[in-house]
Design a protein with these regions (language model features):
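Long, ordered, helix-rich scaffold segments
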Residues: 1-344
Length: 344
């Protein structure tokens, strides 16, 4: 199987039609780190897009054993922990959407989650062993080697919590309570804040404890806002709307706007909700912000840039939201230009 452009540093667009099996082979065995990572991203993307088609046809996605074997080879091989974490991180929904002609965000979310759970189930034992093996060796130190260990350990925790397991959720809570650094605590919070069903109370408790500990650190509070705005749980829009009235949020503070509102605009599942509620909410926020800070409002309006990539019903809702912004009395030129370009 050819590994192309090895050690090549210049940006190159090269179209090579690898098969699924060839991509899995490169992910498992390529000695060029970038090519190995890219093979994984292409393989994961191909499988998720195929699953989208299956789900749209009412079928249950099937996942090949080859992707599990390749991921296991990466996970248990000798290598840089930071690279292993990077290689096994699935492409995000926004990246995947760019590779599709028409996007159904809900189906895309199901497909990506399905692959994550397939990997988590098939590699559960390996994830547990690595999580334990990379436990902190001592007090927190901001050095590169330990940062890589933390990153891989937190990836293992995230994968384990794709499974419906109280034991894995307890592991996240244990890490949250015992962490001596914000990185590990926030990684655990990200897991707990996305805990579904009856375990949502655990996430609420962790969010409250995190805010109480870090409320005087502005940049950490930004992360606290963002983790809620990026949630995949039902009710995320209502939570974000409520947070606009929280004392931690300030419509006059660009960092708070980016943390909460722009993050919500990047939340593929909830911003692009099929009923248009996410579009209407953000349009109202942009209109309110325009009279305070037109430049920031215009950046927020860029969340609508790719509305024409979605299905016709979502396009209808997005167009209506953009029109509502354009019709605002006294609309700034900054926002008008972004909206006009999007509508054009």
């Amino acid at each position: 199987v050819p590994s192309l452009l090895r050690n090549f540093s210049a940006p190159v667009v090269l179209d090579c039609s690898y098969s699924e099996a060839e991509l899995a082979h490169l992910l498992a065995h390529d000695s060029d780190p970038f090519n190995r990572w890219e093979a994984g991203q292409r393989l994961f993307g191909h499988l998720i897009r195929s699953a989208v088609v299956q789900l749209a046809q009412g079928e249950t996605p099937t996942w090949p054993a080859s992707v599990l074997a390749a991921a296991r080879k990466v996970l248990v091989g000798v290598g840089d922990p930071a690279f292993i974490a990077e290689a096994l991180t699935l492409p995000g929904e926004a990246t995947l959407a760019e590779q599709m002609e028409v996007v159904d965000p809900e189906v895309l979310h199901q497909a990506r989650t399905g692959l994550a759970r397939y990997l988590a189930s098939g590699l559960e034992g390996e994830f547990i062993r690595l999580y334990d093996a990379f436990a902190p060796l001592g007090p927190y130190r901001p050095v590169t080697a330990e940062a890589g260990r933390r990153r891989l350990r937190n990836l293992c925790l995230a994968y384990l919590n794709e499974l419906d397991s109280g034991a894995h959720r307890a592991l996240a809570r244990q890490q949250f309570d015992g962490a001596d650094n914000m990185t590990d605590q926030f990684a655990a919070l990200s897991v707990l804040a996305n805990a579904p069903g009856a375990e949502q109370a655990e996430g609420e408790s962790a969010l409250a404890a995190f805010y109480e500990r870090w409320e005087h650190e502005a940049l950490v509070v930004d992360k606290w806002l963002a983790v809620q705005a990026s949630s995949r749980l039902p009710g995320t829009l209502e939570r974000v709307d409520s947070l606009t009235r929280h004392s931690a949020f300030d419509l006059k503070n660009p960092n708070k706007i980016y943390a909460l509102l722009r993050t919500f605009g990047a939340n593929h599942r909830h911003f692009h909700a099929g009923d248009g509620s996410g579009y209407r909410f953000l349009a109202a926020q942009i209109a309110a912000l325009d009279s305070i800070n037109p430049q920031v409002a215009s950046r927020l309006a860029r969340s609508f840039d790719r509305w024409k990539r979605f299905d016709s019903e979502r396009q209808r809702h997005a167009r209506a939201a953009l029109e509502s912004i354009r019709q605002q009395p006294g609309l700034s030129r900054d926002v008008f230009e972004v909206v006009e370009k999007a509508l054009g």
